[in-house]
Amino acid sequence: MTPNRRSTDSYNMLGASFDFDPDFSLLSNKTHKNKNPKPPVKLLPYRHGSNTTSSDLDNYIFNSGSGSSDDETPPPAAPIFISLEEVLLNGLLIDFAIDPSGVKFLEANYPLDSEDQIRKAVFEKLTESTTLFVGLCHSRNGNFIVQKLVELATPAEQRELLRQMIDGGLLVMCKDKFACRVVQLALQKFDHSNVFQLIQELSTFDLAAMCTDQISIHVIQRVVKQLPVDMWTFFVHFLSSGDSLMAVCQDKYGCRLVQQVIDRLAENPKLPCFKFRIQLLHSLMTCIVRNCYRLSSNEFANYVIQYVIKSSGIMEMYRDTIIDKCLLRNLLSMSQDKYASHVIEGAFLFAPPALLHEMMEEIFSGYVKDVELNRDALDILLFHQYGNYVVQQMISICTAALIGKEERQLPPAILLLYSGWYEKMKQRVLQHASRLERFSSGKKIIDSVMRHGVPTAAAINAQAAPSLMELTAQFDAMFPSFLAR
């Protein structure tokens, strides 16, 4: 009794059958057995003896010979020159397409002229069956000749290729590491109408699944990077939903994609479409701010909040909103979280002066002191495994301002604020020095407050007070007529 076999589409060429698995993941070559099998075809570049400067891609040699035993050396085979037309006539096109060297030959010899009859024959052969076309897309080697078709396709050929992609399972192609290259190139090379149809098809898929898949996310990234924003507004609307945003941001691939979307929407305010992009950006950022606390505490989503806080330009308003609405009044708890503590560090570093003042004051005096343990927020953070990094950042900010590492020149009144914060932290560190020395983080904190060259409040006041010569110059400028007498 004949065993049951999976039904497959086969192509018979020169005594060989090419069977495609139903998932189109690979293309297998099954040759009929014979007593003297022909060895694999080896493709070698050939240079004509009379013209050593000609391109290696102009001609190729196929070396073939009869089978021989291991102890025999086969006679040298005569070179056989073959053209693309002969490949077609001999039914070897698919053989070449799935062979590493053969596909290079096809790419190099695929005619550029859209009216060339051989080119039309190659295109028709490779697209005559959806099963064959999709099988090549999923093939390690075959995808390269399909990319060549996509790159040089006329509008009519683009429509045919698009039909093949959709009929063959576009979502499956997006999730395959070879076929996804074909889809990405189509997004880049097809004309507007065909790309629009391709985007319309993509918009019907499970976007959350695509954004969290390490292969298909490259297709979405190509959409965001290459195409006009008005072609992927559907994706921004998708992200602007709380559940969708959390699903994408909490993924190690998706969190980077959200940053790229923000970057694209906020870029180049001088372009005419900026007003439209700002509306989309505001919709997305409203959702991010609303979910800021949850995002900050996630292993991957916290990078999105950090990215917003570190951004400049139009994003500064959203940075300030996040600090004001989400971080303030939660600094102590978030500083003790493994991932949110990174967000707090960034907020201290990039906060504008007014918000930085509020953050510092919250740490120093914003929480009720634990009377039984005699500890306040600063004491807790000094000895916490994550909170100590926040304290180190606070010390670093004050030190940079006091020794003149700030980009802008700070007035004496502001410097006195930094000096006051620095002295509070220094006194507290010295008070707990014996305990802090037990930990490597504690030793770093002690070293940071014992640095030389940090001016005190008295030194800042002395520097701010005008000297006798400065007072004289000011007096002369105010009363020039007095000196003329």
Swiss-Prot record:
Pfam family, one: PUF
Chain positions covered by the region annotation Disordered: 29-48, 55-76
Keywords: Cell cycle, Cell division, Developmental protein, Differentiation, Oogenesis, Repeat, RNA-binding, Translation regulation
Residue numbers spanned by region RNA-binding: 439-454
Phenotype of the disrupted gene, per the record: Simultaneous knockdown of puf-6 and puf-7 results in ectopic primordial germ cells (PGCs) outside the somatic gonads, premature PGC proliferation in L1 larvae and germ cell death. Does not affect germline development in adult hermaphrodites. Disruption with puf-5 and puf-7 results in abnormally small oocytes, disorganization of oocyte nuclei and cells, inefficient yolk uptake by oocytes, embryonic arrest with impaired eggshell formation and cytokinesis defects, impaired repression of glp-1 in late oogenesis, and mislocalization of rme-2 to the cytoplasm instead of the plasma membrane.
Record-level GO cellular component terms: cytoplasm; nucleus
Extra information: Puf-6 and puf-7 are >98% identical on both nucleotide and protein sequence level. Experimental approaches often do not distinguish between the two genes, which are collectively referred to as puf6/7 and are considered to be functionally redundant.
Protein name: Pumilio domain-containing protein 6
Protein encoded by which gene: puf-6
